[in-house]
């Protein structure tokens, strides 16, 4: 990374290197039942990455295929655990299970705003899931998972700018079969699963899968006598396969998932975890204007009830939750799909019709500390919901005696997205806000956290009035502190955002066989996207409107202290545009866009075992709306050079609705690759470069979520994009260029010297970096100051080096039919920054995660007993670190040091899962 050298522990690197010397992801089984025999006899791997059943070695694109056996051995129950066997993939979840994010080659959708679509599209049985996090459910019985890297779109479904994860479940079988599985582990983990399949008639077969999971939480909340980040979920999927003729089949799938869980806890980042924290988590002693050591916000939080031990947790998983606050949430996810395949003789027709309904509500102690600053109450009226209908048609065949393998298709989707939010200020917010202002500057001598306005009675108000010039201005400021102190348990009653997305596309993907060894692939896609948006706000924060009414004139006071305090009081009283001025107000907008994307590939097979290829792809991800009222306007805005704070002064909320829009993301991708495959050994390599324009970035700056479409400027702006000004660093529109480049090398290999022994390995080196000069949109507007660390640095959650390795050994034990199982996998990751604003306090050192499984299996694997461990060495690390909401002290010496680009901001982190272990019993009939 630009800010720190790679420091992955040497022993971790050596561990992975030893496995790499032996062995990438275990590769997929057959794409359809009729290919299984061929795979068993030849070792060939069949995928449908190009819309046709092809040998993996014949596919001229970068794709990893993970088999059901490998998924079972690695303990993968959802797509997060694919990280262990796919080095270019990173899947993580943060503030909510619904907000999971997938990244490929360092690129993914950043942040948890549902208005942003996924850079990495997730499909389950050909049906698009609206956001990556929706794919974090239990998967049931899986045939294989394909991970395609690079822009997608010419093969069908929804387009994606970074890649695709395609999950294929096991189909119904016309031979009877059943299996059961029971697992018990630490944290009182219990997982029960099973499936049954078989014929219902000569032409009709069925399958039912079911999973039930429960587990205690990884965090403890002693204040509320509970645990957090637990599991309590179930999943059921039923299928019917009807084959009335050899040429026609219908596959009907219905599934339902329910989750009733508490998620997601976070703890403070301290200087034992990240050296750049320094003294940020120490109280200021004494509490004085310069505060040579420590941080005044620590004094405030401590004095209002946060135990001082909570600021130095290391990796301790004890939460300090506000009394009565809860992380409880409920999620339901269900849908139905129908896949029709019809062999017309000269062509094959495929139709996939799907309907999905996903709804998730989550409470939270949104400040992640004991002091009650922000919260969301678990409620049936607060949720995010996706209702999606999709229809895909593909027609594929051959022409000119097999010279042309053609595919044409169409896709249509209609999606309703509803977000209802009830974020409110906590019962201690008013005192917290006033103390935050009083404690950090020249007025620190008035600090009195047990008194109204956080000032010493009598003396405090008088001193405030005198310090701000006396007269009416002084009275306004003194009264403003008293008024802000009353801002408790106010905010959103219900804010409702609604977005309808209508997307249709035409696509074609054609393979031209120039010679027996040379192919040219040409693909094209036209996409038309229309989005309609409306929102209605409910808010009871009358303190904001009262502060605006009494203090707006003081924003232009000749007294500098009065101006600063008036701005601080209004800003804290109206954080995130939480104001009764919006109560009952509705806004609406719409946008339309269309885009032509495509791919061109040349592949050459000099020998039967070797293929080389070169490709170019143009990718696209739709623009949309920031579903967050905080983006409508800044707390203090200028009108004709005069500061103001109300919506009315700016023409009302509807006049500002354009501030919520963001542009589509575009990518130009280039790739050179080679694939070598024999029965015993396979190796694939790819060199790639991807240039992203309008890179959609969602960042929480400690106060609000902001969305910018990051671009580069071909003219050096003299580091004006790295200062604290929102007005410097503009670029002429004609000089705007791509803002993000991802380039690197991927290697995947597998060695199978014996049917009972397999070793696999993968390596991804990726340099995913922002340009040196950045702007905030395609017109060249300045980059937001909150993003001033981005220019020239690596993207968040984009480690430069990742290696994966696995060893599988299933030896026969004598002649009784018994066999053993030994499986181990490892993933080593170099340093990376987990925060989208790239503050050094969010950096994560490199680490290695090892999973292992040993077992005994009966004849024909009719039964098995397995012992397993995930994260065997109990490695602690952060998935994402973030600015602790509203918890920033006053900037003063020595925090002007570059080590503290966030001033006195505190930071919190979502930890990854600790070591888990247990026993699994399997039975198959």
Regions found by a protein language model. Name each.
Residues 225, 231-406, 413-417, 456-457, ...:
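Outer-membrane beta-barrel domain signature, strongest for Gram-negative TonB-dependent receptors
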Residues 100, 117-119, 131, 140-149, ...:
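Outer-membrane beta-barrel translocator/receptor signature
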Residues 40-175, 672:
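Acidic, small-polar-rich N-terminal luminal/periplasmic segments of exported/outer-membrane proteins
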């Amino acid at each position: 990374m630009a800010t720190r050298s790679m420091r992955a522990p040497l022993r971790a690197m050596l561990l992975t290197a030893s496995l790499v010397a032996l062995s990438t992801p275990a590769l997929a089984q057959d794409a359809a039942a009729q290919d299984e025999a061929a795979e068993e006899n030849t070792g060939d791997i069949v995928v449908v990455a190009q819309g046709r059943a092809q040998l993996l070695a014949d596919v001229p694109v970068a794709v990893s295929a993970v088999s059901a056996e490998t998924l079972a051995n690695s303990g993968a129950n959802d797509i997060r655990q694919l990280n262990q066997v796919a080095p270019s993939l990173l899947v993580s979840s943060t503030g909510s299970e619904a907000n999971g994010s997938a990244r490929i080659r360092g690129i993914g959708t950043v942040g948890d705003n549902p208005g942003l679509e996924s850079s990495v599209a997730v499909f389950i049985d050909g049906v698009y899931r609206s956001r990556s996090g929706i794919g974090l459910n239990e998967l049931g019985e899986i045939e294989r998972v394909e991970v395609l890297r690079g822009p997608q779109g010419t093969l069908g479904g929804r387009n994606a700018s970074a890649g695709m994860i395609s999950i294929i479940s096991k189909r119904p079988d016309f031979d009877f079969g059943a299996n059961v599985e029971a697992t018990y582990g630490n944290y009182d983990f219990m997982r029960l699963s099973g499936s049954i399949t078989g014929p219902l008639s000569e032409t009709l077969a069925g399958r039912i899968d079911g999973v039930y999971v429960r587990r205690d939480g990884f965090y403890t909340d002693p204040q509320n006598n509970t645990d957090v980040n637990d599991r309590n979920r179930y999943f059921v999927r039923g299928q019917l396969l009807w084959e009335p003729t050899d040429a026609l089949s219908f596959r009907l799938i219905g599934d339902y998932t329910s989750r009733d869980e508490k998620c997601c806890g976070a703890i403070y980042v301290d200087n034992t975890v990240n050296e750049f924290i320094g003294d940020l988590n120490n109280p200021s002693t004494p509490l004085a204007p310069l505060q040579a050591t420590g941080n005044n916000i620590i004094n405030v939080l401590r004095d209002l009830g946060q135990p001082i031990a909570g600021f130095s947790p290391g990796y301790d998983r004890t939460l300090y939750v506000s009394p009565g606050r809860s992380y409880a949430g409920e999620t339901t996810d269900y849908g139905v799909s129908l896949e029709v395949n019809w062999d017309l003789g000269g062509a094959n027709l495929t139709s996939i019709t799907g309907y999905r309904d996903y709804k998730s509500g989550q409470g939270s102690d949104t400040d992640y500390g004991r002091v009650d600053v922000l919260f969301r109450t678990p409620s049936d009226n607060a949720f995010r919901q996706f209702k999606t209908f999709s229809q895909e048609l593909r027609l594929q065949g051959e022409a000119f005696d097999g010279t042309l393998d053609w595919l044409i298709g169409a896709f249509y989707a209609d999606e309703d997205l509803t977000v209802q939010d009830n974020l409110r200020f906590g019962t201690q917010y008013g005192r917290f806000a006033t103390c935050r202002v009083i404690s950090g500057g020249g007025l620190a001598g008035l600090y009195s956290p047990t008194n109204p306005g956080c000032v010493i009675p009598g003396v405090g108000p008088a001193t405030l009035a005198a310090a701000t010039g006396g007269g009416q201005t002084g009275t306004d400021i003194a009264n403003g502190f008293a008024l802000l102190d009353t801002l408790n348990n106010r905010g959103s009653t219900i804010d409702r955002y609604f977005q309808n997305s209508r997307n249709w596309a035409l696509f074609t993907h054609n393979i031209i066989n120039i010679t027996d060894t040379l192919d040219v692939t040409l693909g094209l896609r036209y996409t038309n996207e229309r989005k309609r948006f409306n929102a209605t706000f409910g808010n009871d924060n009358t303190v904001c409107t009262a502060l605006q009414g009494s203090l707006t004139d003081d924003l232009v006071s000749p007294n500098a202290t009065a101006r600063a305090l008036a701005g601080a009081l209004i800003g804290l009283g109206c954080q995130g545009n939480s104001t009764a001025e919006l109560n009952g107000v509705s806004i609406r907008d719409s946008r339309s866009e269309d885009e032509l994307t495509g791919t061109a590939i040349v592949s050459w097979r000099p020998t039967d075992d070797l293929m080389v290829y070169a490709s170019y792809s143009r990718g696209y991800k739709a623009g949309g709306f920031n579903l967050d009222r905080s983006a409508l306007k800044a707390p203090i805005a200028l009108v004709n050079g005069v500061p103001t704070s109300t919506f009315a002064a700016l023409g009302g909320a509807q006049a500002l609705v354009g501030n919520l829009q963001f542009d589509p993301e575009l990518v130009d991708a280039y790739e050179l690759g080679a694939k070598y495959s024999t029965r015993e050994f396979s190796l694939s390599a790819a060199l790639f470069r991807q240039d992203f324009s309008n890179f959609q970035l969602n960042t929480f700056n400690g106060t609000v979520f902001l969305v910018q479409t990051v671009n580069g400027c071909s003219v050096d702006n003299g580091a004006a994009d790295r200062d604290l000004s929102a007005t410097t660093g503009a670029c002429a529109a004609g000089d705007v260029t791509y803002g993000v480049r991802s380039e690197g090398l991927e290697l995947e290999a597998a060695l199978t010297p014996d049917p009972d022994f397999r070793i696999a390995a993968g390596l991804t080196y990726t340099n995913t970096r922002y340009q040196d000069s950045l702007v905030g949109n395609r017109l060249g507007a300045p980059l937001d100051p909150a993003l001033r660390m981005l220019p020239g640095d690596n993207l968040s959650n984009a480690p430069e080096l990742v290696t994966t390795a696995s060893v599988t050994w299933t030896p026969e034990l004598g002649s009784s039919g018994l066999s053993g199982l030994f499986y181990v996998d490892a993933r080593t990751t170099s340093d990376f920054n987990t925060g989208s604003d790239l503050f050094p306090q969010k950096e994560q050192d490199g680490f290695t995660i090892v999973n292992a499984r040993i077992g005994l299996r009966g004849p024909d694997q009719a039964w098995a007993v397995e012992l397993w461990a995930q994260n065997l060495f109990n490695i602690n690390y952060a998935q994402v670190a973030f600015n602790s909401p509203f918890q920033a002290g006053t900037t003063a010496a020595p925090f002007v040091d570059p080590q503290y680009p966030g001033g006195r901001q505190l930071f919190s982190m979502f930890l990854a899962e600790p070591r888990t272990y247990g026993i699994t019993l399997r039975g198959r009939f």
